[in-house]
Amino acid sequence: MNARFKIALVSIIILQIVSLVVFVIYQENLKDTGTKIVLQTIPIDPRDLLRGEYVDLRYEISDVTVENMSCYRLCLGYDLGDSSNRSRSRKDFLSSAQGENIYILLTKEPYRLSTQAISSGSSWYVYDISESNSFDNRPEEIESLVIKGRIEEIEEIFTEIDYQIRITVDYGIEQYFLEEGKGLLIENADDVKVEVTIASNGKAFITDLIVDGTYLNQSVSD
C-alpha cells in the first residue's frame, strides 16, 4: 500500500466521519428549534404492536379522507384539464401517487378535511394537504403547523351519494425504540399519546411517549 493510497483512504474515512457528525448536528438542531406537539395514537392489532424492541404506532392523523373531485388537482397535483393527464386513468394516477411526499397542515381546531373520527383526547386536526409546505389558505386565527409525510396508501371510496379519496400517511414516526421491559406498559395502556417535535421543514421526531398520562422517558429518568 503506497503513501498516496493511504492518504486517499484516510481522507475518505475522515470525510465520512465529518459528514456523519454534520448530519447528526443538523438533525439535533432541527429537534432543538422545532415545535413540540402531542399526537393521539389509535389502537392497532396487539399482535402487531411490538416488534422486538420497537413499538408500532398509528395516529388519528394517519388516515386523511378527502372529499370531491377537486382533490386530484388541489391535493395531489392531478390537473384534470391537463391534456397529458387525459390518457391516464384515475387508477393509474392514484397508484403513481403512492410513495410521494405530502404536506399536512394541522390546526388546533377541526375544519375542512377533518372528516375522520377524532377522539376527545386529540388536540391537532388535519386542515388541508398539499404537495409543498406552502399553504395559501393557512388560517391566521387558528394555531397551525405543517408536518411532512409520505403517501403510504391511497384509495377511492364510492358511495351512492358521495365520493372520497382516503390517504394513509406515513410521517416517519410510526416506530419507537423501547427499553427492555417497557413493552408491557404499552400493551396494557388505556391511552397512548406521543410527544413529537416538528422541525421548520416539516420533519417530525418522536421525543417521548405519554402512557396513561405519564411521560415514559421522564418516568425512567426519575
Regions found by a protein language model. Name each.
Residues 2-35, 39, 43-222:
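Helix-rich terminal scaffold detector
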